[in-house]
Design a protein with these regions (language model features):
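Boundary-proximal intrinsically disordered activation/regulatory segments immediately upstream
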Residues: 2-61, 143-144
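RNA substrate-binding interface of SAM-dependent RNA methyltransferases
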Residues: 8, 49, 98-189
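Amphipathic alpha-helical repeat scaffolds
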Residues: 40, 117-125, 237-245
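Active-site regions of enzymes building and remodeling cell-envelope glycoconjugates
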Residues: 65-77, 108, 200-203, 222-223
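Glycine/small-residue-rich loop that forms an oxyanion/phosphate-binding "nest" at active or ligand-binding sites
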Residues: 69-94, 98
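Short beta->alpha connector loops at strand-helix junctions that form conserved
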Residues: 72-74, 114, 140-141, 163, ...
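Structured adenosyl-cofactor binding patch, chiefly the S-adenosyl-L-methionine
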Residues: 131, 146-157, 219-257
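Active-site/ligand-binding-proximal alpha/beta "capping" segment
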Residues: 185-237
Length: 257
């Protein structure tokens, strides 16, 4: 957090302010304004200490030491909040713009998401990436928006440390494959992940919750990986949740060093 400073807080919140915050629950409004909402004292404190630009902070309790802070009543916070249970601090933040550098594929391990739809899954995957030191995630344009309020909350602050890129995923994978970048994908059939030879760099592609990796992207996967059940002959669940599969996959890659 920046050094504590004294600010005079005047209740100036307007109907237009509340309307703007509420509108940011919708992806179209986030795209048009370039803004997203973050709620909760811990998350907002992390944002204040990050490189992200804060547009406005609203608080009901102890004032937040930031020039953009404004004190509001609990009733006003309830009207603004996008959560079922409002917190005492809400920030409107500028969406960061990142440039995707294709050279990272030969230098780092990168996650790729193929039309993953559930906000909870996206949030968990971003948090996992942060835990396992994966700094970049590339997403198909149909993947759920990482600045959806539910995703932002689910990341527990990891959204500040992981760069999420929305792009033409098929074209990106095609270029990576042409450059001989290892492209791993998780499938119901393939090499046993626990015995497969894994590299320290490349792309790990995770598929949609219902259909898995799409055919248009599967053609560029050079290494198909399979997470086996236990015992191997067991017949039970058809597949793993994509966030759980991501956790297992990232853990195994990092375990190898």
């Amino acid at each position: 957090m920046p050094e504590k400073m004294a600010y005079v807080f005047v209740n100036m919140v307007t109907h237009a302010d509340i309307k703007l915050v509420r509108s940011l629950a919708d992806k179209r409004a986030r795209t048009e304004t370039g803004l997203f909402v973050a709620e909760g004292a811990k998350l907002v404190e992390e944002i204040c200490s990050s490189t992200l630009t804060i547009n406005r902070i609203y608080c009901t309790g102890n004032p937040v030491a930031h020039p953009a802070a404004e004190q509001v009543s609990p009733k006003e916070m309830e009207r603004m909040s996008l959560l079922k249970t409002p917190t005492d601090v809400l920030a409107v933040v500028e969406i960061p713009k990142y440039r995707l550098d294709p050279s990272i594929f030969s230098r780092k391990l990168v996650l790729a998401l193929d039309d993953v739809q559930n906000p909870g899954n996206i949030g968990t995957i971003i948090r996992l990436a942060d835990w396992f030191g994966i700094e970049d995630i590339i997403c198909s344009e149909a993947t759920a928006d990482c600045f959806n309020p539910k995703v932002v909350q689910a990341t527990m602050g990891a959204i500040l440390r992981v760069r999420v890129h929305y792009t033409d995923l098929t074209a990106t994978l095609k270029s990576a494959a042409a450059a001989h970048t290892p492209v791993y994908g998780t499938f119901l059939e393939g090499e046993n992940i626990y015995s497969a030879n894994l590299t320290r760099t490349g792309i790990i592609l995770m598929g949609n919750e219902g259909r898995g990796v799409s055919d248009r992207n599967a053609q560029y996967v050079s290494r198909r990986l399979f997470i086996p059940p236990y015992p191997a002959t067991r017949h039970g669940s058809e597949s793993l949740n994509v966030a759980i599969a991501t956790a297992i996959t990232c853990a195994e890659f990092r375990r190898r060093g």
